[in-house]
């Protein structure tokens, strides 16, 4: 049954406390790692989830885990990047970074190892440390997108971010919704950067994004979304195309979707990308789902694989999921498909 139908069955008197609970989950101050603490090893348990081998669109699920830890700073993961040595580097809502090594056995994700965590921000105000996306630049830097106080932190080195070298601001992002700003960030091979707002939209429904060309000029462009969903992370697929992760979470159910975005029109000077929805899944799918927020492409054995992670909002009713997807078929190209 759809969430809308479920809400229609709830007596109106119960909707007010329910809505307040959902809002509180979104804005409450989360637990966070002590920014003054040294980088530390974190004990994480990984529970295998069903669905191995299940196909959706061009993807095959090759392992899914539910991750948990007694460390109070673990959780709230919002962005994910693949490192050249096979490790994954993530950032979260509480100003923390998390690094781990996926354990792949017989072609499936079987566990995680070498888990470490630390703080990329010494701030104590959530608005000043709300990490949403992370990318590693070919030039040897690490970029983290923050929302609420919309900006991009630039760190020297491709690894755990500790002290930002500089901060990038974009005046056009000042009008983005406080809790719906720069949710997805991508760097193209030529050095161009795409920064996508979660909630700011144009009149045609496309999500507002800022496209910074390699020469440093920045223009506002539109990225088509998936109806009812919000974009949460982006990862470059090949030159001119990227994969975009979307989530739907309303406190009652979670759904997720992946689209492919063709930026060729924007690169050529246009103001709107073409997009096609590849997959969407929910609780009735064979794939596990929660509040999916992080996604990255990694190279394993010379082949691209996709890793997805969910943000549990430091809420015991939610889970931190790590999914590994294989490309079992070519990613389709073509004109935009209505969303």
Task: List PLM regions with ranges.
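Sequence/structural signature of beta-propeller domains
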Residues: 2-339
């Amino acid at each position: 049954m759809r969430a809308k139908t479920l809400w229609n069955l709830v007596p109106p008197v119960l909707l007010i406390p329910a809505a307040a609970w959902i809002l509180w989950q979104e804005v409450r101050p989360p637990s966070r790692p002590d920014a003054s603490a040294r980088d530390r090893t974190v004990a994480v348990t990984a529970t295998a989830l069903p669905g191995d081998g299940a196909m959706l669109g061009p993807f095959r699920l090759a392992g899914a885990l539910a991750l948990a830890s007694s460390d109070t700073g673990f959780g709230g993961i919002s962005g994910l990047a693949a490192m050249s040595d096979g490790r994954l580097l993530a950032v979260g809502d509480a100003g923390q970074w998390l690094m781990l090594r996926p354990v792949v056995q017989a072609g499936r994700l079987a566990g995680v190892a070498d888990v470490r965590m630390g703080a990329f921000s010494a701030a104590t105000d959530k608005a000043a440390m709300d990490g949403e996306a992370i990318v590693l630049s070919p030039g040897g830097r690490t970029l983290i997108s923050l929302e609420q106080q919309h900006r991009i932190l630039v760190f020297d080195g491709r690894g755990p971010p500790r002290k930002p070298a500089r901060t990038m601001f974009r005046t056009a992002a000042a009008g983005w919704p406080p809790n719906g700003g720069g949710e997805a960030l991508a760097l193209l091979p030529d050095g161009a950067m795409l920064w996508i707002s979660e909630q700011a939209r144009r009149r045609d429904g496309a999500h507002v994004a800022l496209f910074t060309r390699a020469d440093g000029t920045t223009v506002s462009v539109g990225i088509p979304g998936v109806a009812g969903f919000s974009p949460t992370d982006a990862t470059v697929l090949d030159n001119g195309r990227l994969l975009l992760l979307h989530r739907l979470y309303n406190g009652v159910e979670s759904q997720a979707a992946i689209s492919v975005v063709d930026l060729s029109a924007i690169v050529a000077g246009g103001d709107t990308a073409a997009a096609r929805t590849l997959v969407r899944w929910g609780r009735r799918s064979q794939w596990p789902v929660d509040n999916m927020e992080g996604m990255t492409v990694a190279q394993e054995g010379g082949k691209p694989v996709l890793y997805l992670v969910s943000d549990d909002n430091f809420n015991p009713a939610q889970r931190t999921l790590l999914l590994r997807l294989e490309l079992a078929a070519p990613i389709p190209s073509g004109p935009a498909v209505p969303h």
